[in-house]
C-alpha cells in the first residue's frame, strides 16, 4: 500500500471501530427530547433503522421519553415509499404539531440505505442516480415546506459489509458526500456516519433473535445515534 493511499484510508476512516455488542458502552438518553424546549416536536423519517431506534427507545424508557418525538418509517423502503406514502404522513404530523404550538418542528431524514442495496435491484446499484433522485426530491421539499420546519439529513450510516455484502461502503460514502454538498441550504447535515466510524458501533439486532445482519444496530448504538441527533439539532 502506498503512503498516499494509506493516508487517504486513515482520513476517511475506512477502518471502522467495531464493538463486541456486550462490551459497548451504554448511555442514558431518556430525557433528551424533553430538554429541547425550542421545538414543538421532532420527526424522524426513515426505514428499518429508524423503526428499530423507535423500538429501542420505547423498550428502554416507555412512551414518556419520546412524547415529543414522532417516527415516520417503513422497513425495507426508501425514496419511492416516501414519495407515495411517507411524505403524506410526515406532512400531517408536521401540521398536527404546528396546530398545538408556534414553535418550529425539527424533521430528521435518514433514508437511503435500502436504495443502495443490490439485493433490492437484482444487479448493480445505480448509486449515483439514486443520490441525484434523492437530491431532486429533498431540494424540492425544502422549497415547499414552511419556514418553521427545521430540516436535517442524517447520513446513511455504516454497514458491516462482511455480514451484508449487498451494500458497499464506497457507495454509501459517495451518496453521503453528494447529498452533503448539494442539499438545499435549509438542510443541516448530521454526520453520524463519521461519528460511528470513528467512535465505534455494533451491528447486532436484538429485535431479530440477536443476529448480526450487518445493517441494524445494537441497543447501545441506537441510543448513541439518537443522542448525537438530539445534540445536533440544538
Q: What is each PLM-predicted segment?
A:
Residues 127-138, 169-175:
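Charged helix-capping and loop-helix junction motifs
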Residues 159-234:
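Catalytic His-Asp segment of secreted/periplasmic serine-dependent ester chemistry enzymes
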Residues 1-8:
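Short, small-residue-biased leader/transition segments that mark boundaries at the very start
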Residues 10-40:
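N-terminal low-complexity, Pro/Thr/Ser-rich intrinsically disordered segments
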Residues 36-129, 133:
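Conserved SGNH/GDSL esterase-like catalytic core that processes O-acyl groups on lipids
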Residues 43-45, 152, 188-190:
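Hydrophobic/aromatic beta-strand patches that form the interior of the parallel beta-sheet core
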Residues 68-70, 150, 186-189:
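Conserved beta-strand segments of alpha/beta enzyme cores
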Residues 110-114, 143-174:
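Active-site segments of SGNH/GDSL-like serine hydrolases
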Amino acid at each position: 500500500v502506498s503512503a498516499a493511499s494509506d493516508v487517504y484510508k486513515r482520513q476517511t476512516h475506512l477502518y471502522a471501530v467495531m464493538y463486541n455488542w456486550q462490551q459497548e458502552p451504554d448511555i442514558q438518553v431518556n430525557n433528551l427530547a424533553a430538554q429541547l424546549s425550542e421545538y414543538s416536536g421532532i420527526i424522524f423519517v426513515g426505514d428499518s433503522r429508524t423503526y428499530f431506534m423507535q423500538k429501542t427507545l420505547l423498550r428502554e424508557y416507555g412512551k414518556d421519553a419520546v412524547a415529543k418525538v414522532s417516527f415516520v418509517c417503513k422497513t425495507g423502503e426508501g425514496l419511492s415509499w416516501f414519495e407515495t406514502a411517507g411524505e403524506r404522513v410526515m406532512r400531517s404530523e408536521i401540521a398536527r404539531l404546528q396546530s398545538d404550538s408556534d414553535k418550529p418542528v425539527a424533521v430528521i431524514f435518514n433514508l437511503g440505505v435500502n436504495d443502495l442495496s443490490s439485493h433490492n435491484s437484482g444487479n448493480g446499484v445505480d448509486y449515483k442516480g439514486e443520490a441525484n433522485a434523492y437530491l431532486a426530491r429533498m431540494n424540492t421539499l425544502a422549497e415547499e415546506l414552511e419556514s418553521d420546519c427545521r430540516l436535517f439529513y442524517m447520513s446513511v450510516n455504516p454497514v458491516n459489509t462482511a455480514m451484508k455484502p449487498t451494500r458497499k461502503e464506497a457507495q454509501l460514502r459517495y451518496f453521503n458526500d453528494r447529498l452533503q454538498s448539494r442539499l438545499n441550504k435549509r438542510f443541516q447535515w448530521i454526520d453520524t456516519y463519521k461519528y460511528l466510524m470513528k467512535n465505534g458501533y455494533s451491528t447486532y439486532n436484538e429485535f431479530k433473535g440477536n443476529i448480526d445482519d450487518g445493517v441494524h444496530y445494537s441497543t447501545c448504538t441506537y441510543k448513541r445515534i439518537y443522542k448525537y441527533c438530539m445534540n445536533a439539532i440544538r
